[in-house]
């Protein structure tokens, strides 16, 4: 397994729309394993393939609870949603930044597992938030896009300043 580089906002590659996965081969299995390793190293609970410059519809998640063990979502699709929920979110691609985002409280998602088997899952609370957040990445959307242009600009400036400090 290998650690992958997580793209950071405002990297334009984060805006790339992911394409469906059609082949379930050894390369895909390695990509999934590498994404899990990267997510754990970065102390995240979810990672979309676009965040590691792999523009396919692939998400890995581990909420580290008893019910929802590590999950792989390939070509995910929300088939039902209800309720409204506002919660603070963060993102591995926008490090150190947290903001409140409105999302559906409950979602039902249809996807394929790492072997191409279809499954459906109902999610609420953190699980629902994480799924919606990661699925946004597959569409080239970030949680900061839900914020005002002024807040987005401040975040961009803060991250650019931090990147310059890290480069020194």
UniProtKB/Swiss-Prot annotation:
Cofactor binding, per record: Binds 1 Fe(2+) ion.
Coiled-coil ranges (or none): none
Protein family membership: Belongs to the polypeptide deformylase family.
Gene that this sequence comes from: def1
InterPro entries membership: Peptide_deformylase, Peptide_deformylase_sf
Biological process (GO), any one: translation
Pfam family name, one: Pep_deformylase
Record has Chaperone as a keyword: no
Source organism, top-level taxon: Bacteria
Group of enzyme by EC: hydrolase
Residues the record lists as binding Fe cation: 91, 133, 137
Active site: 134
The EC number(s) this enzyme carries: 3.5.1.88
Descriptive protein name: Peptide deformylase 1
GO molecular function: metal ion binding; peptide deformylase activity
Keywords of this entry: Hydrolase, Iron, Metal-binding, Protein biosynthesis
Record organism: Shewanella oneidensis (strain ATCC 700550 / JCM 31522 / CIP 106686 / LMG 19005 / NCIMB 14063 / MR-1)
Cofactor: Fe(2+)
Database matches in CDD domains: Pep_deformylase
């Amino acid at each position: 397994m290998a650690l992958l580089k997580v793209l950071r906002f405002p990297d334009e590659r984060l805006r790339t729309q992911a394409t469906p996965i059609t082949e379930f081969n050894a390369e895909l299995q390695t990509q999934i394993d590498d994404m899990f390793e990267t997510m754990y190293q970065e102390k995240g609970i979810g990672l979309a393939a676009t965040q590691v410059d792999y523009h396919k519809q692939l998400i890995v998640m581990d909420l580290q609870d008893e019910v929802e063990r590590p999950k792989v979502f390939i070509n995910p699709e929300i088939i039902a949603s209800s309720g409204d929920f506002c919660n603070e979110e963060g993102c591995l691609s926008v490090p150190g930044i947290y903001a409140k985002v409105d999302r559906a409280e409950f979602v039902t998602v249809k996807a394929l597992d790492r072997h191409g088997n279809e499954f459906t899952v109902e999610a609420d609370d953190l699980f629902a938030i994480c799924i919606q957040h990661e699925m946004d990445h597959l569409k080239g959307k970030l949680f900061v896009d839900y914020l005002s242009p002024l807040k987005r600009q401040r975040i961009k400036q803060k991250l650019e300043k931090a990147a310059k400090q890290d480069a020194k």
